[in-house]
């Protein structure tokens, strides 16, 4: 087993997972339990019902044009004149349908709470769900941006930021956001080969792997969370950000895999570092798990002018296949200031790159360069997330905004926390409780678990017997359970990451029992060796 693991040690945890699955699935008489991936097995149904019902209304709106050809399935573009009245009739005639009731409430919320033009909203939704026009503006549809922006500001704890000061770029999930941002930072000279980038560790593996690619060749500086501090960043680690050689700080908040939000002390520490030492520091925060946290506040809320926020709808709404996300930027930000401070020769080169977009290239904001770069600049006029995707994103946002009691959120939190309690109960340990814990994942610290079960001496022996990777292969081989190695996420502790989102409660009970059984067998082996000494 050791030889097998060593040959695969350089793989990303997500690629290593496939090898672990092969081993865990090798026994046809045993259930394979894959706790390695974060794809949730829950999803929001109401905004999806609304999406499909809206599609039926939109198709009928299309057929108001070219009605003489509807027998062969030809429709035209939706018309805004009278659309509100026709929609209200549709609602009245189909009020018994859950998705339709939600659409009716959405229209009321958009009109009465957000103060948006109801006809313009309906026309954008109908036109968007039909997918019959290019996304205009390419960055994001106008009304969809206003709706999603309200959701982002609320969920990221950024209520102090005026909504109109935030720009959004709708993207194909967090994956696309990361790829676009790294590439535009390089293309615009904001990150160059050899530059130092700080990375909050442990972290989602691509944040470690992307800077190491030859096309970026960045020098990584680890900002290490401390497991003894419940995975918070010590002040001494955050103080590394004072180094003027560090250009940007990448972090996932709440973290992945520890699944802990940054506490108020850490947020204030970063705020003070930026204010007193590093007003030029660029920050990129990926806050996809923020909606699972209690009283969450993003670095974007703390340092809005220094921070690019990446948010994906994938986990909270069970929408990994939809590929929905946004990049948020404050209108006054250090990314634009850094562009202004480039050498004249670099500015001239960028003038040439973006010359087809507008006469005054130097007024082009970084977020708009992201849009252009995402389509090789020349195709900027056809850039943008598909309009049906933007409609679903807007409906997800309205679903959360109208749920003022946060019933959906509380239900999901209870679900994943019950799963964690069940896993650790069967393992024979109390669940890991912390006010900053999010519990979407749990990082099972193999050294800590073995020490608590059978003492420090056994724990030291068990860790010496095999590497973490070997142990995870053994777990897969003997129990059929797939965990991802914590070390692959930048953790310095021997650990395995288990997602608490993608299996059912009884399956987490089985995982806990299987891990406990394996620990008992290891202890019996250890005890036998001790007696023979």
Curated annotation (Swiss-Prot):
Family: Belongs to the class-I pyridoxal-phosphate-dependent aminotransferase family.
Biotechnological relevance of this protein: Is highly specific for L-aspartic acid, and so can be used to produce L-alanine and D-aspartic acid from DL-aspartic acid.
One protein family per Pfam: Aminotran_1_2
Effect of residue 134 to F: Slightly reduced activity
Ion transport found in the keyword field: no
Reactions the enzyme catalyzes: L-aspartate + H(+) = L-alanine + CO2; L-aspartate + 2-oxoglutarate = oxaloacetate + L-glutamate
InterPro entries xrefs: Aminotransferase_I/II_large (IPR004839), Aspartate_4-decarboxylase (IPR022518), AspAT/PAT-like (IPR050596), NHTrfase_class1_PyrdxlP-BS (IPR004838), PyrdxlP-dep_Trfase (IPR015424), PyrdxlP-dep_Trfase_major (IPR015421), PyrdxlP-dep_Trfase_small (IPR015422)
Organism: Comamonas testosteroni (Pseudomonas testosteroni)
Name of the protein this chain belongs to: Bifunctional aspartate aminotransferase and L-aspartate beta-decarboxylase
Activity sensitivity to pH: Optimum pH is 5.
GO BP of this protein: alanine biosynthetic process; aspartate metabolic process
Temperature dependence: Optimum temperature is 45 degrees Celsius.
Residues binding L-aspartate: 115, 256, 497
E.C. designation(s): 2.6.1.1, 4.1.1.12
Residues where N6-(pyridoxal phosphate)lysine is found: 315
Swiss-Prot/TrEMBL cofactor(s): pyridoxal 5'-phosphate
GO molecular function: aspartate 4-decarboxylase activity; identical protein binding; L-aspartate:2-oxoglutarate aminotransferase activity; pyridoxal phosphate binding
Keywords: Amino-acid biosynthesis, Aminotransferase, Decarboxylase, Lyase, Pyridoxal phosphate, Transferase
Gene (name only): asD
Assembly information from the UniProt record: Homododecamer.
Keyword flag Transferase: yes
Role played: Bifunctional enzyme that has both L-aspartate decarboxylase and transaminase activity.
């Amino acid at each position: 087993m050791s030889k097998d693991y060593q040959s695969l040690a350089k793989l990303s945890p997500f690629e290593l997972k496939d090898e672990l699955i092969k081993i865990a699935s090798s026994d046809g008489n045993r259930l394979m339990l894959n706790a390695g991936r974060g794809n949730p097995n829950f999803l929001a149904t109401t905004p999806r019902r609304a999406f499909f019902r809206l599609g039926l209304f939109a198709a009928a709106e299309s057929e108001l044009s070219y009605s003489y050809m509807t027998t062969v399935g030809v429709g035209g573009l939706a018309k805004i004149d009278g659309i509100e009245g026709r929609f209200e009739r549709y609602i009245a005639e189909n009020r018994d349908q859950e998705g339709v009731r939600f659409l009716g409430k959405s229209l009321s919320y958009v009109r009465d709470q957000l103060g948006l033009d109801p006809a313009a909203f309906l026309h954008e939704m109908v036109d968007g769900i039909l997918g019959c026009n290019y996304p205009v503006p390419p960055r994001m549809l106008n009304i969809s941006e206003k709706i999603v922006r309200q959701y982002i500001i609320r969920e990221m704890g950024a209520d102090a930021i005026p909504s109109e000061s935030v720009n959004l770029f709708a993207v194909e999930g967090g994956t696309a956001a990361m790829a676009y941002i790294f590439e535009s930072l390089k293309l615009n000279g904001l990150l160059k080969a050899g530059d130092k980038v700080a990375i909050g560790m442990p972290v989602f593996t691509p944040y470690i792997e992307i800077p190491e690619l030859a096309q970026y060749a960045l020098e990584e500086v680890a900002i290490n969370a401390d497991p003894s501090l419940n995975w918070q960043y010590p002040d001494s680690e955050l103080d590394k950000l004072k180094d003027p050689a560090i250009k940007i700080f990448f972090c996932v908040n709440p973290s992945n895999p520890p699944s802990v939000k940054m506490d108020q002390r850490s947020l204030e520490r970063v705020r003070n570092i930026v204010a007193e030492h590093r007003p030029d520091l660029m920050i990129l925060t990926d806050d996809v798990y923020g909606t699972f946290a209690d009283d969450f506040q993003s670095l974007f809320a703390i340092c809005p002018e220094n921070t690019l926020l990446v948010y994906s709808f994938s986990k909270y709404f069970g929408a990994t296949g939809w590929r929905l996300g946004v990049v948020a930027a404050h209108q006054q930000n250090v990314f634009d200031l850094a562009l202004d401070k480039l050498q004249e020769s670099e500015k001239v080169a960028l003038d040439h790159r973006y010359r087809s977009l507008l006469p005054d290239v130097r007024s082009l904001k970084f977020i708009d360069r992201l849009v252009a770069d995402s389509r090789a600049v020349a195709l900027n006029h056809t850039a943008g997330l598909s309009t049906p995707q933007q409609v679903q994103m807007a409906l997800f946002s309205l679903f959360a905004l109208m749920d003022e009691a946060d019933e959906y959120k509380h239900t999901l939190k209870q679900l994943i926390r019950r799963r964690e309690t069940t896993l650790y109960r069967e393992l024979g340990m109390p669940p890991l409780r912390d006010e900053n814990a999010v519990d979407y994942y749990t990082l099972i610290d193999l050294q800590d678990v073995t020490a608590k079960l059978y003492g420090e001496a056994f724990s030291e022996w068990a860790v010496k017997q095999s590497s973490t990777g070997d142990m995870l292969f053994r777990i897969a081989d003997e129990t059929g359970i797939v965990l991802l190695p914590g070390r692959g996420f930048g953790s310095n502790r021997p650990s395995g990451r288990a997602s608490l989102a993608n299996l059912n409660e009884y399956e987490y009970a089985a995982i806990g029992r299987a891990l406990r059984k394996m620990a008992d067998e290891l202890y019996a082996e250890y005890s036998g060796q001790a007696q023979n000494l």
